[in-house]
Amino acid sequence: MSWQIVKKPMKLATLWLLLLSSLACSPACAADLWTYWVEPCTEAAAVESHCKTGDAELARWALEAWQQSSGGTLRVQAVALEQAARLRVHWVTGRSQLYGEARPIEFAGQRGAEVYVLPSMARAGEDQLLRETVVYLTCLHETGHALGLAHTAAFADIMYTFQYGGDIAEYFGRFRRKLKAREDIARTSAISVADHSALMFALSGR
């Protein structure tokens, strides 16, 4: 009888230890954390780069799309200060003659990146959803580079590079045709199966 009384608490204690150890590192803490900062579209920045106040949301949606594709392996988190961000998004002028660019940096002993996006899209004309499409897909492409993804030659991939030619208008147009409202951007995936595989490979090396 005395043995059974002592044994039962020991089993409960063991169960508690197992439970606590399983909670010690949830998927969130096991994920690769990328803090990020997006340059505010101030009045001065808008004059210089033609950014819009909603562009920061497009950048956030792009990073959240990668996070969702990772299935919990990647976690993104906005921070208020540029210096505290592992990934930093800037708006640039048309003088750069590109849609965007990603440059590697070192952040707290980890791989980080500075991303530059051209938000001035005069070629979109009056179609604001096309303009939003171009800015969003550029953010998605360049933050993909920031996370470690390389260019591809497959037109279906968001990481496709125009160095291989292809129909640039259709690259953006195929996504634009899926949209009825701005909010559809966050609900519509532009990440291909190959992009997802490349993301998981990049994150496996951390």
Name the predicted role of every residue range.
Residues M1-M10:
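N-terminal secretory signal peptides that target proteins for export/translocation
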Residues W3, S22-L23, P27:
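Compositionally biased regions
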Residues A13-A24:
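Bacterial N-terminal signal peptides
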Residues P27-R206:
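Zinc-dependent metalloendopeptidases
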